[in-house]
Amino acid sequence: MIYRYPRYGQLYEASKQLRRTFSAQDFRDLQVLSQLAWFDEEFLKGDRDVRDLIRKGRNYTLEEQRLMGRKQREIMAKVLPVYKEFASRGQIEISATPYYHPILPLLCDSDIASVSHHGVPLPQRFRYPEDARHQLVKAREYMETTFGIAPVGLWPSEGSVSDEAMRIAADVGYQWFATDNGVLGRTLGSTAGAFETYRPYKWKSEGREMHCIFRDHYLSDLIGFEYSRMGAADAAQHFLDRIRENCGGRDAVVPIILDGENAWEYYEEGGREFLRQLYKRISDASDLQALSVSEALAQNGAHEIGHIFPGSWIGANFDVWIGAEEDNQAWNLLLRAREAYEAGKDNVSPAAKAMAFEEILIAQGSDWCWWYGPEHDSANRVEFDQLFRGHLANVYKSLELQPPEELSRTLLHLTVTDLHDKPTGRIKPTIDGMVSSYFEWLGSGNYRLEERSGAMHSQRNIIQSLSYGTDGQHLFLRLDFHELPVAASLELHLKTESVELEITSSRFCLERILEAAFPLRELGVQPGDPVRFQLSVWKEKLPVAAVPQQGWLEMDTNEPGDWPA
């Protein structure tokens, strides 16, 4: 996608060494080309304005950048009407996914994770099946409004199923669901091969029933991950040969299910030629027929099952979204916000109540915990973490409550040692809010925040660094800012056995920096004892930064010679 455009490739290579030397023109070219790269072949070749932008190749003007944006909106506006047209004439069947893409079984009962993974560490129990119902109803209503057809089929987020979740889906009108054949294998108690996978099932539970199909994991992954490295015709033929081989001449229903947006960027021309080759071969074949799920179910009998094993398409379990420390912390924060909503929803206006609940539904989306935990990584994990905690903070704000301080701290396990220098000697700074002398903070500890980590509502933390130290009588603190806070408050949190402290002799001053001094005796710190502390910055009743971002800073108050090396 990048090297197809010479200037884009040049900028990409330059970014590896010279990113900070980019000119305004470099950035404009990058903005235009990085968006053009995602245009479909139909528009790259068929739209004159887009062709002209590609032909120019570099030195784009502001007006050309705006033209590219208009073309994006123009093309995107055509997408939903095309789907609606195809669905209305029966050429495609549109299924639904829960509205904000939650893992339904975990909303119904987070403890279900221990069924598919015995001994998995669990958060506090989250049990709100009514939220799962709301996500399913909201999705179906939106699809009906958008396409004029209420979907009867359900692909649960990440293929995640359980008996309780599917009973709710049946109650709200869904007639079939799909998941992975790994779940089928654990349901049947044996490996699900082609014979078991290539037939419809009818699931029944407590008076509800739905048809279900199980995707061929291997064949679906060939399209998703392998065929992009083959010629289009060879890949299409290989795919159909495998289907024929697996079916062995018998009638079969072969479910092929994959993320519809992720694979094609790796194919030549966005996968268009592969799909043409595949569909042509299916259309020309006498032994193959392309069917929607509902058509396949209507034409084939179903094998009955009385239970579905709880799991997802990844490992037939829920380990991606629960069990790791970061995941479980996220679930605990979600639970506390949900409980706060129940307690406070009747104390605010209907509009505020609706806004608070919408923020909860958003925070239930599976993508947050996709990026928490050890399984996946992204250059934007910090931003995802900020957004998740921001949505939870908005729950409290909508309920006219103070968001808890814990929402100011990242859930990510950042490496603090690379950012933290411990004190090396005693200090006695002048509390004037100015850098009076280089030497006044020499010997202090210093904690530096990564520019993009920690701030809940901005792209970088307002705090640049925290310096701290002692003269044996006081705790001295210094905050350096990327930008001076306006209408903000600062809270000092101590990890101490004291229940309540009254500090009467503190001194502080904010000019270019913030400097403060707190008597150790008024902090409840005995001579020679360590002091453990954390700072947080609040604006508009929301925590926007914390130092450190997790845990506590600890400072020894002994004589410097007694300090550990």
Annotate each language-model stretch with its function.
Residues 417-426, 493-504, 511, 521-565:
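Acidic/polar low-complexity flexible segments
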Residues 1-116:
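N-terminal catalytic cores of secreted or lumenal carbohydrate-active enzymes
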Residues 114-133, 170-211:
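Acidic, His- and aromatic-enriched active-site or binding-groove loops in soluble protein domains
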Residues 1, 57-74, 118-132, 149-157, ...:
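The substrate-binding groove and active-site-proximal loops of carbohydrate-active enzymes
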Residues 94-97, 152, 176-179, 254:
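Hydrophobic faces of well-ordered beta-strands that scaffold small-molecule active sites
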Residues 1-53, 192-425:
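Active-site and substrate-binding clefts of carbohydrate-active enzymes
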Residues 118-156, 241-257:
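CE4/NodB-like, metal-dependent polysaccharide N-deacetylase domain
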Residues 431, 435-505, 533-545:
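Surface-exposed, glycine/proline- and aromatic-rich loop segments on solvent-exposed faces
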